[in-house]
C-alpha cells in the first residue's frame, strides 16, 4: 500500500463541503502552489478528489528520529497527512487533522508515533500549518515542559542541547534571488 493510500484510508471518505469551505480549500491550495518553487523544502500532494481537503506534505527538514536500535539519528524526511473537515472554519482539532506518516519513530517533544501536537486554529491557512510543521520538525518550535510533552525524554534532550537548535535553519519555501553581475573596471 502506498503512502498516499495509507493517508486516504486513515482519513476516511471525502466529506461534503459547503460553498464557503470549498472556496477556502481552493484558496489554500492556490496559495500553497504559488509558494512552492525550486529549492522549497516541501513537496505537497493534493489527495482530494472534488475538493482540496486532504494533503500529503513531505518535508525535507532536518530533524531527529530513532533507528531500529532506539539510537538517535538524523531524519531528513517528515511526511504528514493533513485533513480538513467541513467545520474547520469554526473548529480545529489537531489530532483529527494531522497524522505523522514518516519517520516511523520520531524524536521530538511534540511527536509520538503518528500523533502531532501542534496548535492549529480554526480557519488557519494551509501555508501557515506547513510553516508551523517545518518549525516543529527543525526544533525551532517545541514543548519545553515534560509534563505537557508527548515525549518527555525528547523534551529534556532539547533543553540540554539549546545551543544546537534549531537543527535546520533553512526557510521552508525557497527564495529566488536575482543577481546581475557586471564587470568592475579597475583604475578608471
Predicted regions mapped to residue ranges:
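UBC/E2-like fold recognition across ubiquitin and ubiquitin-like conjugation systems
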Residues: 1-77, 87-188
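Short beta-strand-loop-alpha-helix junction that forms the active-site gateway
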Residues: 84
Amino acid at each position: 500500500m502506498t503512502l498516499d493510500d495509507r493517508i486516504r484510508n486513515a482519513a476516511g471518505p471525502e466529506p461534503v463541503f459547503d460553498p464557503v469551505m470549498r472556496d477556502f480549500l481552493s484558496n489554500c491550495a492556490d496559495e500553497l502552489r504559488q509558494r512552492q518553487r525550486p529549492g522549497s523544502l516541501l513537496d505537497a500532494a493534493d489527495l482530494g478528489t472534488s475538493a482540496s481537503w486532504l494533503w500529503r506534505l513531505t518535508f525535507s527538514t532536518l530533524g531527529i528520529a530513532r533507528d531500529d536500535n532506539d539510537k538517535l539519528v538524523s531524519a531528513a524526511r517528515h511526511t504528514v497527512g493533513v485533513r480538513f473537515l467541513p467545520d474547520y472554519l469554526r473548529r480545529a482539532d489537531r489530532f483529527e487533522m494531522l497524522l505523522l506518516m514518516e519517520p516511523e519513530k520520531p524524536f521530538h517533544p511534540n511527536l509520538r508515533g503518528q500523533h502531532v501536537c501542534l496548535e492549529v486554529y480554526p480557519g488557519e491557512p494551509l501555508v501557515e500549518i506547513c510553516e508551523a510543521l517545518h518549525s516543529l520538525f527543525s526544533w525551532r518550535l517545541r514543548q519545553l515542559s515534560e509534563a505537557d510533552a508527548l515525549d518527555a525524554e525528547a523534551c529534556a534532550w532539547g533543553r540540554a542541547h539549546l545551543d544546537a537548535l534549531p537543527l535546520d535553519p533553512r526557510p521552508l519555501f525557497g527564495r529566488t534571488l536575482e543577481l546581475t553581475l557586471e564587470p568592475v573596471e579597475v583604475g578608471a
